[in-house]
């Protein structure tokens, strides 16, 4: 209630949340934790009472996403407004993290090169499967060149197969084998 905030001499809490839509009409917010939260523990913090996104979308700057925010707090009866900048790795909104296997549903490829956005301290290998879950010859986990590192655009390759062009328009599944890592995104690109 605004009356409660006024009696406590604080600005009504407002935090930045993230939602998603696959069609632009129906929106979902799976995680109710704030994407950018107010700071209620530090006296006179720039974002102590109210936090809002300045723009509807982040700026893409190299491999990072920049989110400009406006923060507000009260000093006595005076409202102080400041600007903040939050940064996130590109496609870093969600990830699968840990050790194990991850398999997609059927996908249709239209490209030649396979890329991942991942941070892997162990190693990651990828294999391609047909609709019956059989490994496609030349694209097995054993033929995959292991990826290790932190890269938003790491190319995955298989020994003897530099291109996925032979798989164009086929329905396939991707299976990831991850040892101590985090995968944020993957995609197939023409170049």
Enumerate the predicted regions with their spans.
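Carbohydrate-active catalytic/glycan-binding domains of CAZyme proteins
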Residues: 1-191
């Amino acid at each position: 209630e605004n009356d409660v905030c006024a009696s406590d001499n604080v600005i009504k809490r407002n935090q930045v949340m993230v939602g998603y839509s696959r069609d632009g009409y129906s929106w979902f917010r799976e995680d109710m934790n704030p994407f950018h939260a107010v700071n209620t523990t530090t006296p006179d913090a720039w974002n102590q009472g109210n936090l809002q996104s300045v723009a509807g979308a982040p700026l893409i700057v190299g491999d990072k996403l920049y989110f400009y925010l406006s923060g507000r707090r009260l000093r006595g009866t005076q409202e102080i407004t400041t600007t903040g900048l939050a940064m996130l790795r590109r496609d870093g909104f969600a990830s699968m993290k840990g050790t194990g296997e991850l398999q997609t549903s059927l996908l249709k490829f239209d490209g030649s090169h396979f890329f991942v956005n991942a941070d892997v301290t162990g190693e990651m290998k990828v294999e391609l499967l047909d609709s019956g879950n059989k490994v496609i010859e030349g694209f097995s986990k054993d033929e995959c060149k292991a990826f290790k590192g932190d890269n938003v655009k790491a190319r995955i390759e298989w020994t003897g197969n530099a291109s996925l062009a032979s798989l164009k328009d086929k329905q396939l599944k991707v299976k990831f084998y991850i040892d101590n890592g985090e995968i944020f995104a993957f995609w197939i690109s023409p170049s």
